[in-house]
Regions:
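Non-catalytic signal-transmission and effector/linker regions of two-component phosphorelay proteins
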Residues: 1-13, 111-133
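A Lys-centered signature of the CheY-like receiver
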Residues: 108
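Active-site residues of response regulator receiver
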Residues: 63
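Acidic catalytic/metal-coordinating carboxylates
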Residues: 68-73
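Two-component/phosphorelay signaling modules centered on CheY-like receiver
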Residues: 19-38
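Conserved acidic carboxylate
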Residues: 16
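Acidic, metal-coordinating helix/loop segments flanking the phosphotransfer/catalytic sites
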Residues: 39-59
């Protein structure tokens, strides 16, 4: 069966500290025609990448807990740049802080097909205030 390549031409950031999960997500995205930044396994690296590549990113996949550090500063930066994202987590999705409760959230272990559907449903890249190529 041929892939739909629904994400062709899109560019996503993966922020995940578990190698196998990150690798699996990256492979699934690339098979759908997307390009991937990362995976990045820590908050500092993710913040740097968002700052450097914000004008290119179509979205991001965020693990909430990165070896004890919460990913929320990255989520805040993405929201500031109006870059959509989805949480993929071992935590209960309903336990997120109020500013993020409306964001898409998938529980681990993540069904890759479900992740691809969520990503395909995120808004397309738009010019972003304060972000210049």
């Amino acid at each position: 069966m041929q892939k739909s390549r629904a994400l062709a031409g899109r560019f996503y950031l993966i922020v995940e500290d578990e190698y196998l999960a990150a690798s699996s997500m990256m492979t699934a995205l690339e098979e759908e025609g997307a390009q991937v930044a990362g995976p990045v396994s820590n908050v500092a690296g993710a913040l740097a990448l968002v700052s450097e590549r914000a004008c290119e990113l179509d979205g991001a996949i965020l693990d909430i807990n990165l070896r004890g550090a919460m990913v929320y500063p990255v989520a805040e930066k993405l929201a500031e740049y109006q870059i959509p994202f989805v949480f993929v987590t071992g935590y209960e999705c309903g336990s997120m802080p109020d500013p993020f409760k409306a964001m898409p959230c998938l529980n681990k272990p993540c069904n890759e097909q479900e992740l691809l559907v969520v990503l395909a449903g995120l808004p397309a890249r738009q010019p972003r205030p304060g972000v210049h190529p």
